[in-house]
């Protein structure tokens, strides 16, 4: 066994081995799934390749391999307790998309494990699906002892999500020896699937060969696949012969850094200790190392600590790390130094960590500083609980989920203070929470393969530079993608030999496109998408097409021109953000249409209005410089030398020519969209908005062209005029004696005369609107108080009886409530009964401060409920309720008077 191998070497051996087996090495993708709402995180190596397994796209090579960073945050309470639990980890994988299958996958696995990693074949143990005789024979053929192979049921060795691709699997285990078998159970641990640290699963291979229609009806897949996953951390643990994953060179440098700033020691051999205090120290170090590493990786991928979804998960993990650091009495300096060590440990492979280092440090230290008060609050709860000797389930849950307190720390502090915990109640709350989280987390499900589209290989060429093309129909599909020869006045998809109509791709919306027959416009396509083999699928409704029919296609040239302007402007915006704000900014999403373009990006703080002005000024300069926009078709190496930017999940084909859009020396990006020929064609630009998409995520909205921006300016002028008129009309109902300055300011506010003044004008108008809201609130409060005083006077004029019964018609509820409350306090021996009729709804308030047995609010509310079938309730001093009725006012008054005198 190669004990000298480092984690980096283990990873590289994996990638080099599969490269030698003609696999394409796929770079590790972002932890944030792109265009996949089913996943919160990339949680497996196959997750970034789903489009290939589903058949939505064909890969650049049917053989793929990777080392993918992943996050799984479902069982964070196990981190540091078990030898192998992590929230962030690397999954090594090799994949076959319709290429090699079971025999080759097993051969590759055996060869890599025994010849390259040097594992003893006699220590390999295998699980297979109970009916998979082929897998059994292949393993035995490689030299595996048949006694080391066990057949398992569907639950353990059949991968099936209920519908879509599925199949049997085989798992590879390694026997680490008796020192990890304290009870000397031997092979029983493996054969009875007992949780242990001796027989460690290192590799799982799924043979995706069936399609489940959804009702457990299985058919053979047209394209059989191999999906594998192996843990780099587990390989390192085995090959470096250490007790746990945390004792490998992937984690120990991080732990040693934390250790320097505490009075505690991380002793690897304490793994074998039964002393609980020693185990607690080990766990604390491991949790801090794991959670900080997870935070570093996620934040560098654009996820900032926040209040919901993945932002909340990172916040919770960081806070757990901070709590454990406090438990170890770690000095504040530990944090930044540990972050630096994490980045240094992994940046040789994960190069994206280095340019994002400052943002990572800033985000984590900010979270630590903000959490200090929260941490203190948590400890205050324990001090308060000492007086009651009890902490409720709800409080425990709040500490764990909201404040990030580890449950074991809560137990420890409670034991020290002799405080009782409602752990049963907490477990019930936590179980419900986990069920919700699991439902929302998403599985690595693969969509059902569409075999018709996968098999469809007939070429169809897209022409960027043609407005219209005479062509013919080469394929027709119904709405379920079944191939047909023709469709008569119906809906479906048509594929043409050639097309000038752009299909939705790379964030650019499809062209407005049309089909002409014999010179007459007959079809407007309402959607255009790409098939797995890149043909453009044109969707139509209430139209007729048949195979080999000759037609003419065209796109709306005016639409295309506007899209080209906005797409090129979006590239300029992207480059300007990098040049003006921060080189670390990267596009995380984009949308381009004729009306506008948007760009999503990650940045810790909101851009100021001054930032936006600066960005806009620079973009206008680029437009004014009349820079040529050129298209280059180059190989991958050349695109790298050009420093071409490429994001998202596109696998830019390393064996094909790539399309690079170059805007002089200002912007260079790989892009398949449509663009202007020169920046002067963009004419003008304006940033219409900056939206927050959550913690640290932003969307800038921009538009181009004189006409579009002029129309936007006119719309804004009309909006401002309408809002001014509305404010004047509203304020006309009030006495503005004390607000003359604001009235003059509103009257003199000028509408913007040019687009360059618009942002400044809009900012000023937003301030006016805020001022208006504050003034309106004051005026409404005064109006309500004045009306309440009038109601009070009316009541005070009717104190001859102990019950003051007053009727109101469509009276303001707030004024009634204020008057009623003040009267009850000022005249404690009187009962005030206010009835307010609005349309067919009756609402009433009853109150008396000095209630008696014979005169109280509860007595009257019960009578009202009985007489009218009303829903009301309260206590002796105060009650309220309501009901619906169509009785006239005179009859109602008589009924209420009768209630009061009986």
UniProtKB/Swiss-Prot annotation:
PROSITE patterns: AA_TRNA_LIGASE_II_ALA. Catalyzes the attachment of alanine to tRNA(Ala) in a two-step reaction: alanine is first activated by ATP to form Ala-AMP and then transferred to the acceptor end of tRNA(Ala). Also edits incorrectly charged Ser-tRNA(Ala) and Gly-tRNA(Ala) via its editing domain. Zn(2+) binds at residues 567, 571, 671, 675. Its EC number is 6.1.1.7. Its cofactor is Zn(2+). Keywords: Aminoacyl-tRNA synthetase, ATP-binding, Cytoplasm, Ligase, Metal-binding, Nucleotide-binding, Protein biosynthesis, RNA-binding, tRNA-binding, Zinc. This is Alanine--tRNA ligase. One of its GO terms (biological process) is alanyl-tRNA aminoacylation. GO terms for cellular component: cytosol. InterPro entries: aa-tRNA-synth_II/BPL/LPL, Ala-tRNA-lgiase_IIc, Ala-tRNA-ligase_IIc_anticod-bd, Ala-tRNA-synth_IIc_core, Ala-tRNA-synth_IIc_N, Ala-tRNA_ligase, Ala_tRNA_ligase_euk/bac, DHHA1_dom. Binds 1 zinc ion per subunit. It comes from Mycoplasmoides gallisepticum (strain R(low / passage 15 / clone 2)). Pfam families: DHHA1 (PF02272), tRNA-synt_2c (PF01411), tRNA_SAD (PF07973). Its main location: cytoplasm. CDD domains: AlaRS_core. PANTHER family: ALANINE--TRNA LIGASE, CYTOPLASMIC, ALANYL-TRNA SYNTHETASE. It catalyses: tRNA(Ala) + L-alanine + ATP = L-alanyl-tRNA(Ala) + AMP + diphosphate. It is found in: Cytoplasm.
